[in-house]
Amino acid sequence: MERGRLVYEGKAKSLYEHPEDENLLVMEFRDDITAFNMEKMDTVEGKGVYNCLISARLFEVLEDAGIPTHYVELADERRMVVERLDMFNLEVICRNMATGSLVERLPFEEGEKLDPPIVEFDYKSDEYGDPMVNMDHIRALGLATEEEVERMRELTLQVNEVLSEFLKDCDIILVDFKLEFGVNPDGEVVVGDEISPDTCRFWDAETEESLDKDIFRKDEGDVLAGYREAAERILRGDEEKLAMLPG
């Protein structure tokens, strides 16, 4: 597929105009990997392919469950076609187990199960370090309406339920994950961005070893091996996507 003008370049993805439809974009997954707000950076050859294929599969799972996303179709192993969204400047985090920043700022035990899950909203800003915000902050900054925030929370919990069950069959624990949302051309709040080892904590169900970006954050070994293991499990039964995996 041809791609048009570069619209946006993020830490690990690039968005291009769609060659035929102004309401669509082509999202390309690069091999860049970052952590700690760009304090740690590297390039891992093939990582973008794993993230693209995993995201495509998980978006398809959500769409099959009736959860609206920006996903339209897979273009190739690195690119997908998505709806053009008016994005909220927010990140929504859903936590099923206590780990990461949660245990650093609150008295939870590492690995503690959270039932019901905890949902947090962060202001998406490298300058301010993505601080957690509540409805008062969101309202004062004009980031979203109360109805939009409630819809994002509702969708996040639905995503959690659907993906937790799907990943259980892949012998993966969905520890926590980050979502981004936007409004599509029809005025609907939908899940955007990606759902991948870059934005989720995936733990092996038996060993609780990381199959995600924590391998890079914590220097725990071969990042690509973890992403590949996650991809092979998540894409099980999807021969078309499995055939696109590197190597």
UniProtKB/Swiss-Prot annotation:
PROSITE patterns listed in its UniProt record: SAICAR_SYNTHETASE_1, SAICAR_SYNTHETASE_2
Any one Gene Ontology BP term: cobalamin biosynthetic process
Superkingdom of the source species: Archaea
Catalytic activity: 5-amino-1-(5-phospho-D-ribosyl)imidazole-4-carboxylate + L-aspartate + ATP = (2S)-2-[5-amino-1-(5-phospho-beta-D-ribosyl)imidazole-4-carboxamido]succinate + ADP + phosphate + 2 H(+)
GO molecular function, one term: ATP binding
Record keywords, A-Z: ATP-binding, Ligase, Nucleotide-binding, Purine biosynthesis
Pathway note: Purine metabolism; IMP biosynthesis via de novo pathway; 5-amino-1-(5-phospho-D-ribosyl)imidazole-4-carboxamide from 5-amino-1-(5-phospho-D-ribosyl)imidazole-4-carboxylate: step 1/2
Annotated EC: 6.3.2.6
SUPFAM superfamilies associated with the record: SAICAR synthase-like
Entry-linked HAMAP family: SAICAR_synth (MF_00137)
Protein family membership: Belongs to the SAICAR synthetase family.
UniProt-recorded name of the protein: Phosphoribosylaminoimidazole-succinocarboxamide synthase
Biological source species: Methanopyrus kandleri (strain AV19 / DSM 6324 / JCM 9639 / NBRC 100938)
High-level lineage: Archaea, Methanobacteriati, Methanobacteriota, Methanomada group, Methanopyri
